[in-house]
């Protein structure tokens, strides 16, 4: 099995080392194509207004001066053009990608790009607490390969990806694994801090600490809160089907 690895924290991020360890438990043919620098919050953006450079760092290992989406696109259209991967893994993100985080997540969007290319794609994220005493990626490192093994043969369907989050616990405290739906974050409560630079000019800095979420039953947010690994299938068809006929009647 040929596996392509990418992320949004950058190719030198600690979580990416964890992803490589996970991938080695699954296959001997690992390819890397990831952003050269931090790209958190890049979403599904493409670099359109300046050139992107692809740099080979070693055997089957490349960095990209662009976004996670750039990285996957370049890998599929250049490095792996004649030998497409069987699986794309994106992560392991340092931090949660739960609920509406998906909208902003470069980690999830890299997997989305893979799904658009018809390739099974999985995003992995490690939820963490700043005051935790255990090794940050312990749960992801311990559970990652086993969770992926159980998903590889699953019928993903067209334009579908899997989003996995690991709880902020030592591996021996994780309660299990749950298949759950996407939850809800209230991003309207996110903070915007206003300041002035040394020249006296105004600037704004976005923060996420004030975001609230709802622990609805059967959601990824609830699963993580209760100490479970969350596994959520996501589809790229964003159509609100129940509203489609209602709107259609207005144009008949």
Swiss-Prot record:
Main location per the UniProt record: cytoplasm
Residues at which a divalent metal cation binds: 8-9, 40, 93
E.C. numbers: 3.1.3.5
UniProt KW Repressor keyword: no
Reaction(s) the record says it catalyses: a ribonucleoside 5'-phosphate + H2O = a ribonucleoside + phosphate
Entry function: Nucleotidase that shows phosphatase activity on nucleoside 5'-monophosphates.
Cofactor: a divalent metal cation
Keyword match Calcium: no
Cofactor note: Binds 1 divalent metal cation per subunit.
Organism name: Erythrobacter litoralis (strain HTCC2594)
UniProt GO cellular component terms: cytoplasm
Entries under Gene3D superfamilies matching the protein: Survival protein SurE-like phosphatase/nucleotidase (3.40.1210.10)
EC class: hydrolase
GO MF, one example: nucleotide binding
Subcellular location(s) per record: Cytoplasm
Lineage: Bacteria, Pseudomonadati, Pseudomonadota, Alphaproteobacteria, Sphingomonadales
InterPro entries cross-referenced by the UniProt entry: SurE, SurE-like_Pase/nucleotidase, SurE-like_sf
Protein known as: 5'-nucleotidase SurE
Recorded superkingdom: Bacteria
PANTHER family: 5'-NUCLEOTIDASE SURE, 5'_3'-NUCLEOTIDASE SURE
The entry's keywords: Cytoplasm, Hydrolase, Metal-binding, Nucleotide-binding
NCBIfam families: PRK00346.1-4, surE
Family according to the record: Belongs to the SurE nucleotidase family.
């Amino acid at each position: 099995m040929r596996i392509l690895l990418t992320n949004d924290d950058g190719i030198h991020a600690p979580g990416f080392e964890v992803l490589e360890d996970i991938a080695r438990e699954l296959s001997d043919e690992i390819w890397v194509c990831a952003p050269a620098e931090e790209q958190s919050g890049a979403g599904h953006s493409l670099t359109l207004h300046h050139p992107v450079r692809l740099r080979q760092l070693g055997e089957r290992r490349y960095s990209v001066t662009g976004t996670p989406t750039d990285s996957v696109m370049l890998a599929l259209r250049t490095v792996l053009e004649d030998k497409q991967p069987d699986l794309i893994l994106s992560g392991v993100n340092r931090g949660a990608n739960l609920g509406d985080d998906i909208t902003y997540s470069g980690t999830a969007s890299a997997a989305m790009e893979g799904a658009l290319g018809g390739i099974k794609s999985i995003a992995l994220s490690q939820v963490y607490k700043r005051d935790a005493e255990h090794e940050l990626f312990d749960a992801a490192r311990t559970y990652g390969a086993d969770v992926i093994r159980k998903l590889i043969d699953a019928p993903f369907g067209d334009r579908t990806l899997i989003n996995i989050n690991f709880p902020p616990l030592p591996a021996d405290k994780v309660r299990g694994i749950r298949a759950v739906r996407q939850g809800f974050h209230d991003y309207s409560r996110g903070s915007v801090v206003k300041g002035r630079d040394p020249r006296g000019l105004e600037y704004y800095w976005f923060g996420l600490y004030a975001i609230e979420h709802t622990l609805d039953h059967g959601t990824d947010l609830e699963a993580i809160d209760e100490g479970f690994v969350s596994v959520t299938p996501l589809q790229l068809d964003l159509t609100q089907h129940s509203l489609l006929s209602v709107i259609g009647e207005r144009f008949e």
